[in-house]
Amino acid sequence: MGESIPLAAPVPVEQAVLETFFSHLGIFSYDKAKDNVEKEREANKSAGGSWLSLLAALAHLAAAEKVYHSLTYLGQKLGGQSFFSRKDSIRTIYTSLHNELKKVVAGRGAPGGTAPHVEELLPHLSEQLCFFVQARMEIADFYEKMYALSTQKFINTEELVSTLDTILRKYSSRFHHPILSPLESSFQLEVGVLSHLLKAQAQISEWKFLPSLVTLHNAHTKLQSWGQTFEKQRETKKHLFGGQSQKAVQPPHLFLWLMKLKTMLLAKFSFYFHEALSRQTTASEMKALTAKANPDLFGKISSFIRKYDAANVSLIFDNRGSESFQGHGYHHPHSYREAPKGVDQYPAVVSLPSDRPVMHWPNVIMIMTDRASDLNSLEKVVHFYDDKVQSTYFLTRPEPHFTIVVIFESKKSERDSHFISFLNELSLALKNPKVFASLKPGSKG
């Protein structure tokens, strides 16, 4: 007979409780996580020591995480509620939790009813959880900042990406204990998705085809991985007259908002790079694919042209100062192309119903030059009628490098509300500050 294989040492009860708690938290089962540690605390209330203190802190952590992922704390006005209905700000909740965890760290070696090696583990975990709580506060502040930006004319996402990357670097490997791995994974996923989406927004606004395509794909892959967490979970619903059914767990508002931001960016990407994408498929399939976009900007413009007999609607990219500009689609990084000059510095990256009307382009560029200050306000609609060519031009600028122009080969009033409304709606759809406003649950986004 061979030698018997030694059995692994049994996992201490405390460690098993911790592993169960963090695995629940990692799949956003806040209530289960909270219930488990509260039951454990009730069963061991005579024990005292670090274990009991940590269990109390963990119950508060589960509650804080539920509020954090719901985003209900955004835009709270201080003093706007009565004392009894007042909701503590997320910062207050996490600060209080941080103080609780600090006490566990400070109580290292305090007498308690747990084994010595467990008493060593608890302060170590609490120390790492302190960093996690600090990271949460900084990301919560970041969401507050994004929500506040929804009232701005233009959102500089490059600044947001820089702030987010700084937070990620600061807390990278700060809560790395194996027991905390579900927490670390969900943190990395969330911040990774957000960073990719904001980078994609900045890259689309610079008309960078391949970088924005890759970044959007990375965000999509991470969101898919995250979404499977909810798909795998089933919750049982008992019916009034007996029987029960199971359905997938409803994801938290934060996840749904990130999906919404991705959908908006896909619509913008498919509009800005319509020319490059349409080369990869048939016209009918491209039309069917863009119709699924939300909003369907291509369909919106096509309907407007048919309804009001517009000669052309174009999205113009001002590539002056852009050394990397090489035209539609992907270009090898080492391929050489002379920098555009003259009218070629203002290409129509989107032109409907057909190619840009060359005869109108000098007029369009002249208006863009003469009315630059109005267009740079990023909210005004500029009107110009040229009696020589019997044509009317309406222009607006949704973001710094892009201008929308609507051309009619007839005289149109600058007060025509249909045209002004169309340009304002199209411009707003491209800026889409509403998606930042919709961070707050219940807002019209």
Curated annotation (Swiss-Prot):
InterPro entries: C12orf66-like_central_sf (IPR038060), KICS_2 (IPR018544). Keywords: Lysosome, Membrane. GO terms for cellular component: intercellular bridge; KICSTOR complex; lysosomal membrane. GO terms for biological process: cellular response to amino acid starvation; cellular response to glucose starvation; negative regulation of TORC1 signaling; protein localization to lysosome. The keyword Zinc-finger does not apply. Signal peptide: none annotated. Pfam families: C12orf66_like (PF09404). The keyword Membrane applies. It is found in: Lysosome membrane. As part of the KICSTOR complex functions in the amino acid-sensing branch of the TORC1 signaling pathway. Recruits, in an amino acid-independent manner, the GATOR1 complex to the lysosomal membranes and allows its interaction with GATOR2 and the RAG GTPases. Functions upstream of the RAG GTPases and is required to negatively regulate mTORC1 signaling in absence of amino acids. In absence of the KICSTOR complex mTORC1 is constitutively localized to the lysosome and activated. The KICSTOR complex is also probably involved in the regulation of mTORC1 by glucose. Part of the KICSTOR complex composed of KPTN, ITFG2, KICS2 and SZT2. SZT2 probably serves as a link between the other three proteins in the KICSTOR complex and may mediate the direct interaction with the GATOR complex via GATOR1. The KICSTOR complex interacts directly with the GATOR1 complex and most probably indirectly with the GATOR2 complex in an amino acid-independent manner. Belongs to the KICS2 family. This is KICSTOR subunit 2. The lineage of its organism: Eukaryota, Metazoa, Chordata, Craniata, Vertebrata.
